[in-house]
UniProtKB/Swiss-Prot annotation:
Family: Belongs to the RuvA family.
Described function: The RuvA-RuvB-RuvC complex processes Holliday junction (HJ) DNA during genetic recombination and DNA repair, while the RuvA-RuvB complex plays an important role in the rescue of blocked DNA replication forks via replication fork reversal (RFR). RuvA specifically binds to HJ cruciform DNA, conferring on it an open structure. The RuvB hexamer acts as an ATP-dependent pump, pulling dsDNA into and through the RuvAB complex. HJ branch migration allows RuvC to scan DNA until it finds its consensus sequence, where it cleaves and resolves the cruciform DNA.
Region annotation Domain III: where it falls in the sequence: 149-197
Location of region: Flexible linker: 145-149
GO cellular component terms, semicolon-separated: cytoplasm; Holliday junction helicase complex; Holliday junction resolvase complex
Coiled-coil region list: none
Gene coding for it: ruvA
SMART domains per record: HhH1 (SM00278)
Top-rank lineage group of the source organism: Bacteria
High-level lineage: Bacteria, Bacillati, Bacillota, Clostridia, Eubacteriales
Main location: cytoplasm
Protein source organism: Clostridium botulinum (strain Hall / ATCC 3502 / NCTC 13319 / Type A)
Location of region: Domain II: 65-144
Keywords: Cytoplasm, DNA damage, DNA recombination, DNA repair, DNA-binding
Protein's name in the database: Holliday junction branch migration complex subunit RuvA
Length: 197
């Protein structure tokens, strides 16, 4: 129904953001990867959207890129993968890394997404492997490996901060501002310094 939404970015919650357009606040569910790339609150943004209607729920899902929206829709074609699971998968890394993991049959990367078990990961790989085109094949393998390693470090650092009592939202925000070239231990130390100010 809606192709996209433009408006002022008002607030962020665990799995959705609020965009104001014509004095109406729209609740837009989105992925962690889109959230990590959003500008400061108060700025104008545009998200490509998909509306999902069920008997007990109506929701709008939005993403910064058409590529992420397309991947979201593709994931929904898999039996057992709903909107929540699709967002979870898109939150473990960027779209390119997820596509690469599916294409390479990398169950380990896919099962890092909360709520995605081994059987679901296998089903995703089986059904989508031949449907996915990966633009990142234009990049060299070293760059791809570095992307996966960076995403893994970010996830582990966020998990460590959550264990220490910080919220996932707070942890993500701080970790994403840290230098990803550092070791996992250095990233956590840098984040803690910032949080303890």
């Amino acid at each position: 129904m809606y192709e996209y939404i433009k408006g002022k970015y008002i607030d962020m919650y665990k799995d959705y953001i609020v965009i104001e357009n014509n004095n109406i606040g729209y609740k837009i569910y989105t992925s962690g990867s889109t959230m990590a790339k959003l500008p400061s609150i108060g700025e104008n943004i545009m998200l490509y959207t998909e509306q999902i209607v069920r008997e007990d729920f109506i929701g709008v899902y939005g993403f910064l890129t058409k590529d992420e929206l397309s991947m979201f829709k593709l994931l929904l074609t898999i039996n057992g993968v709903g909107a929540k699971a699709a967002l979870s998968l898109l939150s473990i890394s960027n779209v390119s890394t997820l596509k690469y993991a599916i294409k390479m049959g990398d169950e380990k990367t896919i099962t890092r997404a909360p709520g995605i078990g081994k059987k679901t990961a296998q089903r995703i790989i089986l059904e989508l492997k031949d449907k996915i085109e990966i633009d990142i094949l234009e990049e060299d393998d070293e760059q791809i490996i570095n992307k996966v390693a960076d995403d893994k470090k970010v996830l582990e650092a966020v998990a460590a901060l959550v264990t220490l009592g910080y919220s996932e939202k707070e942890a993500n925000k701080v970790i994403n501002s840290c230098d990803k070239n550092n070791s996992l231990e250095q990233i956590i130390k840098e984040a803690l310094k910032y949080l303890m100010k």
